[in-house]
Amino acid sequence: MAKSRKVVIPYAPRAAFAEFHDRSERWACIVAHRRAGKTVAAINQLIRAALRCERPQPRLAYVAPYTSQAKDLAWGYLKQYTAPIPGVRANVSELRVDLPNGGRVRLYGADNYNRLRGIYLDGVVLDEYADMDPRAWSEVIRPALADRAGWATFIGTPKGRNGFWEIYEKAKVSPDWFALRLKASQTGLVPAAELDAMRGELSVDEYAREMETSFDAAVAGAYYA
């Protein structure tokens, strides 16, 4: 039998995300202000799950609204935090990292969500879900979790009362869901002086939405309902 090897990932969770990492619920929803660190937390959750999964050939996915956005938001973090793992292989053309236990973490864009048809998933993070077509979840991603009883985490900043709001409302009252809401005025992650400056530069609705995670702030332009 091969000996297990201790691997230390260079990630120190922010206190605001400690309960997220310690949760036991299968489903999770995080509504967080800008620059809270939600993508870093989510990527490390995927890495840990891929390393600890007891099923053969674990498959984990990170989904952003667009493939280019997934690369910009998460690829650097995925490479950074998996770099210390012996035998890890990064494939930039496919935006995936292969781990020595057979696990794989891959980045996708919801703009081409049918690319996920036919695959299985042990876990998935949907980042900035408010900007996604909800059919990506209901028609493709949710069925991909079924046979392996995979988990899902929805994260993002509000954009009105759309599909992300519906997910959060469900998460708040369902026993099999974990819900977390992080407002900049409460977390202390953004310096107070910076928040004061932003209040003078952003509109009232923009600040309420981006920093105070308000679902009721007005949103310019169209979004999926």
Regions found by a protein language model. Give the residues of each.
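Pre-P-loop entry segment of helicase/translocase ATPase cores
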Residues: M1-W27
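Conserved P-loop
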Residues: E25-E94, L182
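Residue-level preference for the first positions of well-ordered beta-strands
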Residues: W27-C29, R59-A61, V105, G123, ...
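Short, solvent-exposed loop/turn segments at secondary-structure junctions
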Residues: R35-A36, T67-Q69, K159-R161, T187, ...
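Inter-Walker segment of RecA-like/P-loop motor cores
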Residues: T67-D122, F215
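Walker B catalytic acidic pair
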Residues: D127-Y129
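ASCE P-loop NTPase helicase motor core
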Residues: D131-L202
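ATPase catalytic-site recognition across NTP-hydrolyzing enzymes
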Residues: T187-A225
